[in-house]
Amino acid sequence: MRINSVHGFANDRVWHLSFSEFIAIPRIFPMRVNCCHDRDLLVGWAEKSRTQIQLRTSQQGSCRMNVDEQLKQQLDEFRKDFQRLKSEISKVIVGQQEILDDTLISLIAGGHVLLEGVPGLGKTLTVRTLADALHLEFHRIQFTPDLMPADLIGTQVIAEAGDGRKVFEFQKGPLFSNVLLADEINRATPKTQSALLEAMQEHSVTVAGVTHILSEPFFVMATQNPLEMEGTYPLPEAQLDRFFVKLLVKYPKVSDLETILDRTTENLKPRAEAVLTGEKILQMSQLSRMIPIANDVRRYGIALVVATHPDHELASVSARKYVRYGASPRGLQALILGAKIRAILDNRYHVARDDLKSMALPVLRHRMILNFEGQAEGISADDVIRKMLADVKEDALAA
């Protein structure tokens, strides 16, 4: 059947859709369909997830999405698991709730996180605690100016085979883990920083012409010091774009400092226990991708991204004045994936514009390069994004 040819449905008629047709529903019917009768309904059966979706018309002719009990249970479990993981990490990490939310969203979405802040704010401890709470293999690499790519990936060593022959054998580096902490990544040279590129994007590394697949989930959490500190190298644009979000770690509140002292200066030291597995994280990732997004909301996300492009007709005033290069398509992908998870956490079964707005700062701030005028005036990427969110109209790309 051709769904996009349907404008109204006969009473009590049921359409049984394939999975590909089911996925097309949010694009064809962006939650507003003009139907003829009050009792009309469209039923789509998602074969892969065994999930039934119903679109029912109201007397005004608009449709609302009813998610069946099975999917509701899955999404309720998603929220409970997310909160359980966050609560376990919070036993060790004091405050920084927004940082924890965006970090876990990135993990579930299959992305990587870049944390920026001065030393001593708990960036390294956050990554260690996350690995403990997930019972995943964890490795830490302290980036220094003399660190070489082989120290990260691994190298070929000469070994003796069973028959006495000498053969080359690949000795894996610390990159082969589920959770990798790249500590103070901007203290290493660009050559070593670039060694992470293939691993972060392809989840594999190539050594001596042989490709080695990394185990899933693979999550890189890098920390960096502000660039104005001595001995730092700015990350190349290609590597910055590989990070799902960039999070700015701020100083804790006074009340949080008191709690930190209570937890760290007494005999009992809190420690996170494993509450989820890597397999569970992968399941949550697959479930989050099933959340539909209406066509007009998707177009609003596109409008936000192109508004960062100074040469685009929809560019915001601040982008035209202060931005040299805007966000890439990878930034749009991260914006949508993050918004889907935000929708689940907000107990909704579709993406709203507010979900996109809430992800705009962490997703876009490191994907924009300011021009000389912006740098000279002390303008930050966050300033440009906030102005852009105020300027971009919700129907900027209306069909």
Predicted regions and their residues:
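C-terminal engagement/docking regions of AAA+ P-loop ATPases
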Residues: 67-69, 313-399
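Pre-Walker A (pre-P-loop) alpha-helix and adjacent loop at the N terminus of AAA/AAA+ ATPase modules
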Residues: 76-113, 118
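Conserved C-terminal "switch" segment of AAA+ ATPases
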Residues: 75-78, 92, 232, 246-318, ...
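Short beta-strand-centered segment that lines the nucleotide-binding/catalytic pocket of NTP-utilizing
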Residues: 137-149, 209-213
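Walker B catalytic acidic pair
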Residues: 183-184
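Conserved alpha-helical scaffold flanking the Walker A/P-loop in AAA+ ATPase domains
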Residues: 161-180
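Canonical AAA+ ATPase core
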Residues: 159-163, 188-192, 200-290, 340-342
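Walker A/P-loop
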Residues: 107-144
